[in-house]
Amino acid sequence: MDEDKGKRDPIQMSLKGCRTNNGFVQNEDIPEQDPDPGSRDTPQPNAVSIPAPEEPHLKAVRPYAGMPKEVLFQFSGQARYRVPREILFWLTVVSVFLLIGATIAIIVISPKCLDWWQAGPIYQIYPRSFKDSDKDGNGDLKGIQEKLDYITALNIKTLWITSFYKSSLKDFRYAVEDFKEIDPIFGTMKDFENLVAAIHDKGLKLIIDFIPNHTSDKHPWFQSSRTRSGKYTDYYIWHNCTHVNGVTTPPNNWLSVYGNSSWHFDEVRKQCYFHQFLKEQPDLNFRNPAVQEEIKEIITFWLSKGVDGFSFDAVKFLLEAKDLRNEIQVNTSQIPDTVTHYSELYHDFTTTQVGMHDIVRDFRQTMNQYSREPGRYRFMGAEASAESIERTMMYYGLPFIQEADFPFNKYFTTIGTLSGHTVYEVITSWMENMPEGKWPNWMTGGPETPRLTSRVGSEYVNAMHMLLFTLPGTPITYYGEEIGMGDISVTNFNESYDSTTLVSKSPMQWDNSSNAGFTEANHTWLPTNSDYHTVNVDVQKTQPSSALRLYQDLSLLHATELVLSRGWFCLLRDDSHSVVYTRELDGIDNVFLVVLNFGESSTVLNLQGIISDLPPELRIRLSTNSASKGSAVDTRAISLEKGEGLVLEHSTKAPLHQQAAFRDRCFVSSRACYSSALDILYSSC
């Protein structure tokens, strides 16, 4: 019994016959003290057993479960909780639908955003004359890359580089030996790839020349065609002709652009081949589907290299009449054998033939395969020189059939005598004939025409630049025009060139050092202009009144003013001296009024006689005379010197395009209005 009790006592204390209750046993369970101390056994140590604390059972620990379901339902059904909840729910639903509806509405009413080729100027470069990087006297691709910072400082958005393909003609124009090779004088394919990457790193775009009509007579295709080798037999236009004692009798009277017969006898094939240009430039046979596929494959090759677009040159020559009928003489009384100049025939059977536009549209479809990524639209421009305005407009395509984004507008380069009337006629001719919704463009120069300064005179260069940047559409500048470069005199040149176009291809004038800073070589492929000591980039950078500084101001104005890129254009007046027009946009009160004097003497304009509610004074935003910038002019008597131009600005709530008196003289490519409250453009106005 005691043994059992001892087992139950976890702790026992013995002190001189006293027992203390440890609190874990009942008092009655403690045995009584032995009266005989001697009979007590020696105390033995007792083990203390402390049980480990029990781990709480996981199922016993539960989170707070909240209000029971029955109670929750009791409260949630009360009106003071149910009504706010339903209001918030339906407000959320309505807000979501309103947001979706507003987004759809903005998308529907907003006009199409401007593409990159619409949003800024294009700068055309003749690569052999821009900048030499390897000291051989010839410009090259690395030279262009070195000057990209200069180009971006002009607020240029797109570079247009003319032909750089491997060519047998020394002026590297159109006689291409290999469409997939860079001519060594310009560099390597790696140089081109580096240039494309650098251009894109600067946020710029690149378009290049492409000449599908013909090749060099040294092209492998032509060499194979001469020997009737396989599929290349009909890659060119061959026809039987007689050749006796070195004298060729051609199949018909068709003439080359450069004069004389467009047929040349080939000693290998014993037939005549057709060439619209030089005999070294045989025309491809675009009635052969295999030729069209070859050209599309070349287009794909350059697009895969990162090119953003093409200028398709000489496309009106792609097809000729099948039956080889003689073309009609301009002067029917002229002896046929004396007709040798291109202008002496009507070229009804060798240009703009039925099916030509279908080929161009097919090129467009090939390019569209690379235009599907956002911001990667591929541009197509078409060269349409010497075409009537009606034929030129055909390159825009049809309402539902896409073709060129625009044909290049070179009509300013063909003005005979500069005046207010002739400038007005060029503008109205394009704007009145351009299909609805299409985009205009304006060029003042190029490698095939005399330079702007030499055509119109240095005193009108600034006014022409002001015109270029304030007209609606894309301005296109030929290298050197921004500083007023002129033609050079070329005599006794001993290479195979079209000498009439060499005058506008002189080296770019960068500074007043040797060779105008174009090259460190001892010679240049063409002579520099003798005025390069004063007409150069470095000098004009520091002159507030220089052509370069005004060009930069105008390009910046074009880039920052929505009115100039999207607004209405209203022609108000033209005479032998002046052209007056406004640029305005619905929703923006600020209006630009442009006055330009292209006459041979000074003139005075009364603008209030044209616009009755015009303020008595207007502020000059920009002027060809930098000293008058920011000042005010009397609108009843604006005095303009010869070649002077002003960009005036004022505020009005009554834009001219909404007034019946001016409505028929106003044009817009894509109708747009501005909401200042939402800071958006919309088209339903």
Curated annotation (Swiss-Prot):
Q: What is the effect of changing residue 140 to G?
A: Loss of localization at the brush border membrane
GO molecular function terms attached to this record = metal ion binding; protein heterodimerization activity; protein-containing complex binding
In the record, biological process GO terms are: aspartate transmembrane transport; carbohydrate metabolic process; gene expression; L-cystine transport; L-glutamate transmembrane transport
The annotated topology with respect to the bilayer is:
Single-pass type II membrane protein
Q: Name the tissues where it is expressed.
A: Expressed in the brush border membrane in the kidney (at protein level). Highly expressed in renal tubules in the outer stripe of the outer medulla and medullary ray (at protein level). Also detected in the renal cortex. More abundant in male than female kidneys.
Topological domains on the Extracellular side lie at: 110-685
Where it sits in the cell: the answer is: Cell membrane; Apical cell membrane
Record-annotated disulphide pairs: 241-272, 570-666, 673-685
SUPFAM superfamilies documented for this protein: (Trans)glycosidases
Key word Ribonucleoprotein present: no
Keywords per UniProt: Amino-acid transport, Calcium, Cell membrane, Disulfide bond, Glycoprotein, Membrane, Metal-binding, Phosphoprotein, Signal-anchor, Transmembrane, Transmembrane helix, Transport
Residues passing through the membrane, by range: 89-109
Q: What does this protein do?
A: Acts as a chaperone that facilitates biogenesis and trafficking of functional transporter heteromers to the plasma membrane. Associates with SLC7A9 to form a functional transporter complex that mediates the electrogenic exchange between cationic amino acids and neutral amino acids, with a stoichiometry of 1:1. SLC7A9-SLC3A1 transporter has system b(0,+)-like activity with high affinity for extracellular cationic amino acids and L-cystine and lower affinity for intracellular neutral amino acids.
> Know the name of this protein?
Amino acid transporter heavy chain SLC3A1
Taxonomic lineage from the root: Eukaryota, Metazoa, Chordata, Craniata, Vertebrata
As recorded in Swiss-Prot or TrEMBL, the protein's gene is named Slc3a1
